């Protein structure tokens, strides 16, 4: 079963956000740190939405299999 595009996009945003945050910390760039933290949070939320979509899809498939 394929993962939802929200899960994939969320994982990408979390990774990019973590990298931005780390570079911001290493260079003392507070703006980049904040942008990275925000992008990580956005990615985490998007990933959770994707997980919920996948769970709903699996339930629908299970119900349809019983019919």
UniProtKB/Swiss-Prot annotation:
It comes from the Bacteria. Residues 41-61 have a biased composition (Basic and acidic residues). Residues 37-67 are annotated as: Disordered. Pfam families: CsbD. InterPro entries: CsbD, YjbJ_sf. Belongs to the UPF0337 (CsbD) family. This is UPF0337 protein CC_0938. It comes from Caulobacter vibrioides (strain ATCC 19089 / CIP 103742 / CB 15).
